[in-house]
Amino acid sequence: MSTDEPLSGNPSSRTGQNDARTTRPMPVAGEAGADGFIASLSNGRYQLVERIGAGSIGQVWRAQDTTLQREVAIKTINLATSADPSTEARFRREAIATAGLNHPNIVQIYDSGVDGHSAYIVMEFLHGPNLQSIVTKRGPIDWRDAVPLLAQVAAGLGSAHRLGVVHRDVKPANVVLSSEELTSTPKLVDFGIARLADQQATALTSTMTAIGSAAYMSPEQAAGERVGPNSDMYSFGCLMMTVLTGQPPFPGESPVAVARAQVYDTPPLLRSRVPDAPASLENLVAALMNKRPEARPSATETVAALNAIHGDPDAPGLIEPPRPAGPGT
């Protein structure tokens, strides 16, 4: 899981209750030690300006890169809760893999550092809200506006998948716009953080941190099985349902109940909530939320389908709806 805030973003897009801010230059685990920790690992390069979010394993800061004179976002991560001595090495591997993702719809990673107990990641600062904030404040996005935006998000996922990188926490809060305009560039954030946090968590902690993401977990992820790119695509289908309808496919207060629904329940059809949506879009969402991972469209297929819908919503879709399960299946 990620912290409550995505890796980068605008303070106006905060969804948590943390509103503490600072404008002091550099004093990452706790708030008081964040400046000193980052300063020691970066030779004073980064100056913290404002804390814009906090969660169970870290904080998100707006900062200034004093070397390149640019605004950046810094996420600090607390590794001290892990008893596994390999946590630091895993973080380094995740940071390297994420930094290797070069795509206009993936947040750009500039730098990272770790000292065994705390770590930080430096990335581009995004001035827009995340999709969850937009849906919460404004309601669902009209499908005509959402389709081209969603195609870009799927393109970012496809780029990562081709390099063997799985996001593991695809949800509206982890898609941030580059500006306040809905037509601005959407960028995926928090690659690898979900895996890092899950590997640290006890069973109880894992259950508690699932509250924010259970609504977007694939059935195999909810069951604790190994996940791959197909898991991200199921989560993307859930994200599409939220963006287009204003709520996830299986809303609920209990993460355990929601996770169980992901495994066993049939997702609602898109047009049961958005009657004017084209059948091709409904079929795509249903196919993405197929319980069988191998039956889901890939990111590349999803991009093609969304682009086709954007070009001609009334044309036959590129993705067929899932076939009903037969007796005994």
What are these regions (language model features)?
Residues 154-165:
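Protein kinase catalytic-loop region centered on the HRD/HxD motif
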Residues 149-150:
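Activation segment signature within eukaryotic-like protein kinase domains
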Residues 76-100:
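AlphaC helix of the eukaryotic protein kinase fold
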Residues 116-130, 134:
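Conserved short submotifs of the Hanks-type protein kinase catalytic core
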Residues 215-315:
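C-terminal lobe helix-coil module of Hanks-type protein kinase domains
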Residues 82-86, 178-226, 253:
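Activation segment of protein kinases
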Residues 48-55, 60:
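Protein kinase glycine-rich loop
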Residues 112:
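Activation-segment/catalytic-loop signature of the eukaryotic protein kinase fold
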